[in-house]
């Protein structure tokens, strides 16, 4: 009986940790690009349901524990971008285009190869620049609202030391308690506790497509889908990368009119469902990801109450909880950005330009960071006669699968050593290129979804 319940319990934990660790980032991001409280609640509901549908479909179809989540780094990108010209409808249009690009990457391997061609230091530096503003929020909160922020940060520190996966959820519980003790009950008087779908007709303009849709696609691919695949490969699975991109991209497109910004493979929380803690038998772990998807969809029903809570709290306190959730991703992104000595200056330029938050020609800093770092890298490599960075010494892992598959993946923590610390977000890992490229490949040995012999 315990063996049957083990993957179900692992799935419940995966859903709870994933939701509680980063829903504040999602709400902050949606509100930053112009969503009202009702539209932000609708967006959170949309990404929960879309993630759940994708996880259930992929788990049942392929019998692989492919956990799906919203793009936490993508939500941080929304915070860094702020309101785009044209407001919320244009942001919704950017979400839709980003989802369509993910579908295209699953259908056309060349697009996936183009994303994988972005040097890892540049991708990591861009992600670090996107995350930095939110990661400084805990410091600002300690200065601006110390009575509320000090207990939250202390709870995070203690739990991070003794129970890392519960550090951010625990900090959130303390924040909720602090808000409840300092906010009159009448503050919830007009709040809508159950979310309602708020559909928005998408609109488009060039600056939002370049400044939001394209960076959102790149961040989601490099910081979520690639590490998520690497986790599965590290646990011995041969996941169908193309199928995962098509499923998550399609659900992103469907969720966009309701305010959903991006759905993708989970990265850190993927280890909760794919590792031996989910079940000793790898063939049974897919039950954990299906349970997690179902649980996340149900947790979406609390989007209205979560939004009402965020609206009552001092904005800097909510940003502080979000920043604590992203510290692990920031550390990983910085490690990736500075891993190659020959590329460090270009990575630093990318980081500085992205973190500056500058807007030029209506396009945000993430795009210009990529451009600045890419140009500098190109000039330095051309002057020196080509790349001088040392090759990675890690042994690549090949993962054949039907249709679009994955190229050799290099990751710093490929197996059970993955520590589920925060949410489904993680920066690029390892060295070299971004690391996962869709391509055509034959079916590997064994049944579909059964881990290959290591």
Predicted regions and their residues:
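Helix-loop-helix hairpins and the membrane-proximal interhelical loops
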Residues: 1-42, 169-241
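Hydrophobic alpha-helical interface/terminus motif in multipass membrane transporters
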Residues: 29, 78, 114, 135-139, ...
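Terminal cytosolic tails of multi-pass membrane transporters
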Residues: 374-390, 442, 449-454
């Amino acid at each position: 009986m315990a063996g049957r319940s083990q993957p179900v319990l692992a799935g419940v934990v995966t859903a709870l940790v994933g939701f509680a660790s980063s829903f504040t980032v999602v709400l902050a991001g949606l509100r930053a690009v112009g969503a009202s409280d009702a539209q932000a609640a609708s967006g959170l509901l949309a990404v929960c349901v879309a993630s759940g549908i994708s996880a259930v479909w992929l788990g049942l179809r392929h019998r692989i524990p492919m956990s799906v989540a919203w793009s936490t780094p993508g939500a941080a990108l929304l915070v860094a971008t702020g309101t785009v010209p044209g407001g919320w409808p244009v942001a919704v249009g950017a979400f839709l285009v980003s989802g369509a690009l993910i579908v295209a990457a699953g259908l056309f391997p060349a697009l996936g190869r183009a994303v994988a061609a972005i040097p890892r230091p540049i991708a990591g530096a861009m992600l670090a620049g996107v995350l930095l503003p939110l990661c400084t929020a805990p410091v600002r909160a300690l200065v601006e609202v110390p009575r509320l922020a000090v207990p939250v940060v202390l709870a995070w520190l203690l739990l991070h030391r003794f129970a890392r996966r519960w550090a951010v959820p625990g900090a959130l519980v303390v924040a909720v308690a602090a808000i409840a003790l300092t906010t009159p009950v009448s503050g919830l008087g007009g709040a809508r506790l159950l979310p309602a779908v708020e559909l928005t007709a998408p609109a488009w303009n060039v600056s939002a497509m370049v400044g939001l849709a394209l960076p959102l696609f790149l961040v989601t691919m490099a910081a979520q889908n690639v590490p998520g695949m690497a986790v599965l490969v590290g646990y011995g699975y041969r996941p169908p990368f193309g199928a995962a991109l098509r499923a998550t991209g399609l659900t992103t497109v469907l969720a966009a009119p309701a305010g959903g910004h991006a759905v993708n493979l989970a990265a850190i929380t993927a280890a909760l469902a794919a590792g031996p803690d989910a079940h000793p038998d790898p063939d049974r772990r897919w039950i954990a990801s299906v349970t997690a998807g179902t649980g996340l969809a149900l947790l979406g029903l609390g989007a209205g109450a979560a939004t009402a809570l965020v609206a009552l709290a001092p904005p800097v306190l909510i940003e502080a909880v979000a920043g604590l959730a992203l510290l692990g991703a920031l550390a990983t992104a910085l490690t990736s950005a500075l891993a190659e000595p020959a590329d460090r200056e270009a990575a630093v330029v990318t980081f500085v330009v992205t973190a500056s938050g500058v807007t030029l020609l209506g396009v945000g800093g993430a795009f210009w960071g990529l451009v600045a770092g890419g140009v500098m890298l190109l000039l330095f490599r051309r002057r020196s006669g080509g790349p001088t960075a040392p090759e990675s010494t890690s042994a690549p892992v090949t993962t054949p699968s039907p249709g679009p598959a994955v190229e050799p993946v290099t990751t710093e923590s490929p197996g059970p050593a993955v520590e589920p610390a925060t949410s489904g977000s993680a920066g690029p890992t390892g060295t070299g290129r971004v690391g996962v490229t869709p391509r055509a490949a034959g079916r590997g040995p064994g049944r579909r979804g059964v881990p290959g012999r290591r």
